[in-house]
Amino acid sequence: MSKLKTLNRQFISNLETHKVTTDAKRNLILSILKSTTTKREAKNYLTKYQNQFDFNDDLDFNKNIKIKNEQLSLTNRDSQRELFINRFLNQSNPFINIYDREDVKLQKVPLRLAIFKIKFTKITIKQWKGIAETFKRLITLGISPIIMLDYDHLPSNSFKNNELYMINQGNKMLNYLGRPEEESDLKVTLLRSLFTSHKGVPTLDSLESILIPLYQGIIPIIQPIVYNADASKQEFLESDKLLLGLSSALIEKRTTDLLSIEKIVMIDPMGGIPSIERRQTSHVFINLSQEYSDILSELFIGHIEPKYRDTHVNNLNTMNNVLSFINEKSGNDETTGIITTPEIMSINIDQLNPIIYNVLTDRAIISSSLPSTTNRTPHLSTTIIKKGVDVQIFDIDNYDKDLTMQNLFDDKLVNKEKLINLLNDSFGKSLDVDPYLDRINDNIATVVIVGDYDGAAIITWEYSKGEKIAYLDKFAIAKKNQGLPGLADVIFKIILQSHPFELIWRSRKNNPVNKWYFERCCGCMSAPDSQWKIFYTGEVFDKKIDRFKRNPRHKNGVVNIDRKLQQYSEICEGITPSFK
């Protein structure tokens, strides 16, 4: 009878454990779907991180019966990590392939790394508690964090005093982030002297000293102490050099299926890179391939104090160096840079924490192409950075011939076949090529090509009542890139910067993109009997609008809105459709 009671208690306990596990998995999936705004974002996240979760694991109700064979266990994340640790400890190569009993090669479950460089000043205990919760959430979402401590603010003349200070701060940080003996807390370990420096270049002595804690679910915290091989002594190294050294070691000493660096995060009290356009608040998104030199120049025009400017310049340069290196070595642009404040990292709401939100969606909390002058666009202290895509812009300022499509084709600046294929693919229709090119050939205002024809925009000059008005004739993104973050914003931002004074475009009334357009325009209109919705924007609408038509002539500082809308309607309704 007692044996039956024991089995009954065990069965009830297993049911309760199963319910807790199932609820946790359900809540995780629901939170992912809630935080991602499109089905494609949710799918992209789950495709990348699905192996980090054991969604298909069933509770083993009978622990005396082994229902999983070796092949099944080696497809499991935790089993693979245990195998890698044993290989490390046995001094064998952990990066070699994994096979089952039938010598079938198994896919490895990679570590998805996020490297955090934390500036250890002005972080309150309350913020540390929030930061700890953010790390827990990131781990739940499949991220393996690595923390690097930034002590660059310390004087460089006393190693001993600095070392004592760092030990004290490191111990405090261990307490802030959690104690390993407590089940629900983070597991963290403090590491030092992992690097040897030769001629100022740090190299990682032992990759396993970082990977083993990660495989055990422990967050390594790296102190910026290195062994100087030239001077035979320990010393501090600038955190930015250490960040590049760590990224280099992780990229160069690994196989592509073992780990990936997903995020490079700088936690700095000063926040993201300031933008003049956004009234000194942060750039929302930076496409380094296109914007790096311009933003660097902007920082030096005197709108911020030199000591603050130097910090932002240093952060931007470091991000550019690290992301460019990773891009070159890995051959992809999957690594994202994030610069934000301790206060913002401590926010524990997925949609408001830019780090968590970026893990889920790979984009910023708001769109970078939203107009910064409107009250409905929030101002942020976070900058999202990508190595990004190359951008080609052709307009009258950078082309010394007559700006026609035929000249751009003849000079091989624009590939006609690729452009037409992009337009056909983007719109899902066949372009009526000759009539279309004949219509726009002599009216080109700007042509934008992004990447290898991943996206494009064609802006033409259209005429009404003796005035020429910029018209967004084509805005195309390849189907494989539609719904992906950043690309549409990059193109549309260039469009607005190219024609800031006045721009119009049209879209079919049933186009699902119209909501996106509406958020980026000054206004829109549509006639009941028309198939088109007409959008307009530009600095011209910063002027006073003469709604009562008391000024028949267009005076300086006043815009006759009735006349403008008539012009826009005449242009947009008069252009023949381009597709068959």
Swiss-Prot record:
<comment type="similarity">
    <text>Belongs to the acetyltransferase family.</text>
</comment>
<dbReference type="InterPro" id="IPR011190">
    <property type="entry name" value="GlcNAc_Synth_fun"/>
</dbReference>
<keyword id="KW-0809">Transit peptide</keyword>
<keyword id="KW-0028">Amino-acid biosynthesis</keyword>
<dbReference type="Pfam" id="PF04768">
    <property type="entry name" value="NAT"/>
</dbReference>
<protein>
    <recommendedName>
        <fullName>Amino-acid acetyltransferase, mitochondrial</fullName>
        <ecNumber>2.3.1.1</ecNumber>
    </recommendedName>
</protein>
<keyword id="KW-0012">Acyltransferase</keyword>
<dbReference type="GO" id="GO:0005759">
    <property type="term" value="C:mitochondrial matrix"/>
</dbReference>
<comment type="function">
    <text>N-acetylglutamate synthase involved in arginine biosynthesis.</text>
</comment>
<keyword id="KW-0808">Transferase</keyword>
<keyword id="KW-0496">Mitochondrion</keyword>
<feature type="domain" description="N-acetyltransferase">
    <location>
        <begin position="403"/>
        <end position="560"/>
    </location>
</feature>
<comment type="pathway">
    <text>Amino-acid biosynthesis; L-arginine biosynthesis; N(2)-acetyl-L-ornithine from L-glutamate: step 1/4.</text>
</comment>
<dbReference type="GO" id="GO:0006526">
    <property type="term" value="P:L-arginine biosynthetic process"/>
</dbReference>
<dbReference type="GO" id="GO:0006592">
    <property type="term" value="P:ornithine biosynthetic process"/>
</dbReference>
<dbReference type="InterPro" id="IPR006855">
    <property type="entry name" value="Vertebrate-like_GNAT_dom"/>
</dbReference>
<dbReference type="GO" id="GO:0004042">
    <property type="term" value="F:L-glutamate N-acetyltransferase activity"/>
</dbReference>
